[in-house]
Structures are given as structure tokens and as C-alpha cells.
């Protein structure tokens, strides 16, 4: 996540990576322990903590007032939920994230970009209903399916899942999307 934040900053954006596990004492160095900690989070409280970032951003002198978010896996679901719950959001990018409840989609004011892994049947099962709701509510969106790759294809620290070609294309699309909606 820190590397993705660095990449967004290098692309010219004010980039902030909230630590979802801060209320539980921070992120353990051991990834298995960190995954276990995520199970302890209360979804509603966690969403409120992430929304507070958007209360903070207007206070920064280096903010242009146009806000976006990007998330991966659990963070992809968070990006979708932020799109529903932060009216000031202009662009939300979700990588292989669980979709919001269909009845909540009407609240989205941001343009949405979605990246999915072709082999990710669990997450992909929610795509048809989400896409239908986006269309029904005239929400601008892009949906990109990367065939033949697994969930977490953008995670270059997971060699069994990382797919360099798909990851580079998805990141290029993300920055282009941000350039279109946040500059």
C-alpha cells in the first residue's frame, strides 16, 4: 500500500494511505497476523474512520479540492463504499473489491473505475448486479476485466498472483482516470 501511495504521489497527486488497523494498534509486521486483525475490525466504525480522511483533506493547502480513492481487495471494497458515502468524491477506483449493496449505488456521485481478475469467481459474482445498478443510475464507470489472472494480480509482493502485464495496464488506466477526473 505504501508503494502504491508513493506511485500516486509520483504521478502528481496528494496521496494518503490511512492505516485501517490503527484503531487496533497498527499493522503487525507478520502478514498472517495482519489478516487476522482485519477480522476484528467493525465495518461501520472502519468506514467512518476512512470517511474522516475526506474531512481532513480540505484543510491541506496543497489540496485542489478534487478527491479520489483507490483500493485493492479489502481496500477495493472500501473504495466502493467510499463512493457511496462520500459525496465530495470525484473518482473511485476499485481493484477486485466487493461491490456495495445495489440499493446504495444511487448515492454514488463519483466516476467509478473497476478492475477485476478473470479467475476471481467469488468477487466477480457481484459484477452483473453492480454494473446494472451503475447503468440504471447513470453513474459514469469503466469496468476492466483481466482474463487469465488471479485476485491480487496487482500485488507485486505476492509472486504467485502478481501479473506484471495486467498490473502495469491497470495502473496506467488508474492514473489516466485520475488525470481525467481529478486534475
Task: List PLM regions with ranges.
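Serine-hydrolase catalytic machinery in alpha/beta-hydrolase-like enzymes
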Residues: 1-59, 155-157
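Short alpha-helix in the alpha/beta-hydrolase fold that links the catalytic acid
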Residues: 4, 124-134
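Alpha/beta-hydrolase fold nucleophile elbow
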Residues: 61-72
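Gly/Ala-rich beta-loop-alpha elbow adjacent to hydrolase catalytic centers
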Residues: 71-75, 79
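A conserved short beta-strand
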Residues: 88-98
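Short beta-strand/loop motif that positions the catalytic acidic residue
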Residues: 108, 114-116
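Acidic catalytic loop of the alpha/beta-hydrolase fold
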Residues: 119-124, 151
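C-terminal catalytic histidine-bearing segment of alpha/beta-hydrolase fold enzymes
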Residues: 135-183
Amino acid at each position: 500500500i505504501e508503494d502504491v501511495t508513493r506511485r500516486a504521489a509520483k504521478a502528481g497527486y496528494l496521496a494518503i494511505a490511512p492505516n485501517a488497523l490503527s484503531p487496533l494498534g497498527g499493522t503487525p509486521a507478520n502478514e498472517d497476523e495482519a489478516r487476522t486483525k482485519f477480522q476484528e475490525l467493525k465495518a461501520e466504525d472502519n468506514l467512518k474512520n476512512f470517511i474522516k480522511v475526506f474531512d481532513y483533506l480540505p484543510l491541506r493547502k496543497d489540496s485542489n479540492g478534487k478527491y479520489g480513492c483507490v483500493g485493492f481487495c479489502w481496500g477495493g471494497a472500501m473504495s466502493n463504499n467510499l463512493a457511496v458515502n462520500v459525496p465530495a468524491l470525484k473518482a473511485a477506483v476499485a481493484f477486485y473489491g466487493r461491490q456495495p449493496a445495489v440499493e446504495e449505488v444511487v448515492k454514488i456521485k463519483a466516476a467509478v473505475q473497476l478492475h477485476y481478475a478473470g479467475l476471481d469467481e467469488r468477487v466477480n459474482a457481484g459484477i452483473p448486479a453492480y454494473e446494472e445498478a451503475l447503468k440504471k443510475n447513470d453513474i459514469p464507470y469503466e469496468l476492466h476485466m483481466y482474463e487469465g489472472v488471479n485476485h491480487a494480480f496487482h500485488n507485486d509482493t505476492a509472486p504467485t498472483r502478481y501479473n506484471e502485464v495486467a498490473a502495469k495496464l491497470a495502473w496506467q488506466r488508474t492514473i489516466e482516470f485520475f488525470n481525467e477526473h481529478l486534475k
